[in-house]
């Protein structure tokens, strides 16, 4: 039954695209989102996105948007704001696909012959991987570099551990993140993931939101500082303050706006 349901998701994706008729995140527009990569890098991203879009076709976020929006946003942070290479962008998509659907065997996709006639050559594949191949065709031919698989495995391991709301647990969790990050880029991708979540905190229920801002304060802000991601650290601190102390945040931002208006007025008067 699980295989049949999964195949239906893929067929739905084939008909209406990753986001459905109301959005423009098709394979072509995803390709255009990452112009900084060469042809090989874009092909890698296209393959990873095809898997994620099929796997996540029926998943939605708390705001009702398709869940694929989350890995797309994380991938854009990794590419545009941090400057990570294409294999990291591919790892973002594959992580979310396999986190939601651990039955997907990414390494099996790599072993599929370049040309498959009928059902020949598919005997070693899981039903889910066969469904992916049938739905996406040439987009999935070939596999991924070994470092991509390792990054995905690291991200998936980190996703299974849940920190407690204490500083001692936070320190232990930070150590686990580093331990599971055999490739240091895994930690950077996890920070990019958290930044995307923080930018969309409004969609989460209050209890979940409070848990996430506390995790961010204790875990991700210190990690971002350690790695020299100072812009991301500052933004997460700002979002934390906005949700943890909303009244103080509004008072400070209003004062800053008033100061900015005064500065602009004085500048204009000086120019005149």
Give the residues covered by each predicted segment.
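Active-site helical microenvironments for divalent-metal-assisted chemistry
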Residues: 1-116, 126, 137-272
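N-terminal basic, low-structured, amphipathic or hydrophobic segments
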Residues: 122, 126-132
